[in-house]
Amino acid sequence: MRIRLDIAYDGTHFRGWAKQPTLRTVQGTLEAALARIVGSDVQFVVAGRTDAGVHAVGQVAHVDLDEAQWSRIESRQGRAPQDPAASIARRMRGVLGAYPDATVTRSSVAPDGFDARFSAVWRRYRYRLADSTAGYDPLRRHDTTAHRGVLDDQAMDTAARTLIGLHDFAAYCKPREAVSYTHLRAHETRG
């Protein structure tokens, strides 16, 4: 049974998405939580990996559960019966704790043919910068890059607008069979 997982995380204390021995990663944390629920190891496939310190909202992954794992999901619905696939997110949140830095916001049976990596049709990235003119908001310290000088908003906006449109980034990619898209279409920039 393929399950789609919608994920959010604060990457501040993670060493990126991809599971690595001895390092705390988003994938390792979430897979361990689900493995505890289904009683055996699982492996997530994600729409796009992130680096250390990168946050995500709306990240999508999928996991394939075998018959025994799915049976454990179905047989442990608790007092409030609900869709077994939807219960995975709730149960993972329970394992992860009250205020986790990674969570599954939604889980559902994936539609036929769904693959988190290859079914993704768009991504949104947000980069936050603050300069010395505005001061630094301590509540944004984990998601905003502080620049000691003064940023030229107009120059940055002009440069960012050159990215709008369709561009081929094949020259920046390692040749790999699994990579089928090297084009990027930027739709907007915001100052």
PLM ranges: what are they?
Residues M1-E188:
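Structured-RNA-binding interfaces characteristic of tRNA pseudouridine synthases
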